[in-house]
Every structure is written in C-alpha cells, then in structure tokens.
Amino acid sequence: MGWLYMQSLNGHFGPRQYLDAQCTHTRPELTSKVLRSALVAMRVYYAAVEHVRHTTDKRTVFAAVCLVRYNPRDREGYIFGYKDMDESMGPCESECPTPILDLLTPTDSRYAIEWRARCRENAAARRALANKPSPRPGQTIAFDRPLSFSNGRTLDRFEVVANPRSHRTVLFRAADIGGFYRISNVKKHSYRLIDPA
C-alpha cells in the first residue's frame, strides 16, 4: 500500500493518537485494540494491536508499523501522511521498543520472527550505547582505531574539553598537535577513557 496524506488529524492531538484511533475498532467479526504504541523519532509508529475474533474468542497480538511524515506547516496543507504495514511484511524499520515486543503473541510468519529478532538486537545495542560512559571534560579519550578527519589528519587520542557554546556537548583537543575537533556519535566508536592523574 502507498502513502496516505491528509490535511488534518481529525481532532487528534498528534500522529500517534490518530494512528491509535485508526487501529482501534469493532466490527461484526472482530475487535481491534491498541495495547501499547510509540512514535519513534517522529518518523515511525509502532503498536501492539490486539485482535479478538468474536466467533472463536481467538486472541492475537501483532505489531503494526507505520512510516510517518508530519509537518504542520506544509505549504500544500497536507500536514500528515503515513504508510502502514505489519510485522509479517518484514519492514526495514526495526527500532520497535521492547515493551511493545513483549506484548506480541507467538507467530508462524518467518518475516515477523526475523523482524522481532532484529528489533531485539537493536534494542540491546541501544542499551549498550546508553550504558557506555560518556567522555567528560578533563579526561583523555583513546580510540581503538584512529579517526580520519576532513583536514587529512588521522588521530586516535584526544583531551576532552568543555564546549563553551553548549553544556550538552564536549570538544576534543588533539593530544599531540592541539586543535579542536568535533566527533559526532562518539559512543558508536570503540574507546577507553583515562581519568586525569
């Protein structure tokens, strides 16, 4: 299915609430209800959706995944768009939060099983990054592999320095030659921190 765009959220507070409402309904044959949902980075919606069939009382909980585009200031007036799918389609997006994955019932779909495994691997990687110690001013950071910079230098050891323009980020001063560097996504690199003596 393609993208569906609209000019309003039909009274809903935001994209997540709109999509929750779209996945919650009662029909003669089944009841559908969102048990838990999340809008990750304002671009992907994940939900644990419960289907209960009225004739058999069979209950299944599967993952709904929607790509989201939300721009309240869109020039053409189409402020919200989404593309929906479910886990059985094996979506590329695999950042589903663990609390949603924990609600899903077992499935036979190979694509869904692989997607769930990818989501759990990504969640473990996010936890590992979050638990990794952040460089603090005064420390020395030594990277396991040298980093290449646009000025042609390749360096692996820096002094961590407070950024005078931002209290949330730090700068890195080359230990041997001086000069300040910014290293984005520093936690994605393998390094060790050395405290000052």
Segment roles from a protein language model:
Residues 2-42:
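Negatively charged, low-complexity tracts enriched in Asp/Glu with abundant Ser/Thr
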Residues 19-35, 46, 53-55, 86-91, ...:
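A composition-biased, non-transmembrane "mature-region" signal
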Residues 40-48, 141-143:
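A short hydrophobic beta-strand element
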Residues 44-54, 66-69:
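Exposed beta-strand-loop-beta-strand "reactive/processing" segments of non-cytosolic proteins
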Residues 61-78:
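A short, surface-exposed beta-strand/turn
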Residues 81-126, 173-197:
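Intrinsically disordered, low-complexity, charged/polar segments
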Residues 132-149:
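Short coil-to-beta transition motif at edge beta-strands of beta-rich domains
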Residues 146-185:
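Basic/aromatic-rich interaction segments and small domains that mediate binding to polyanionic partners
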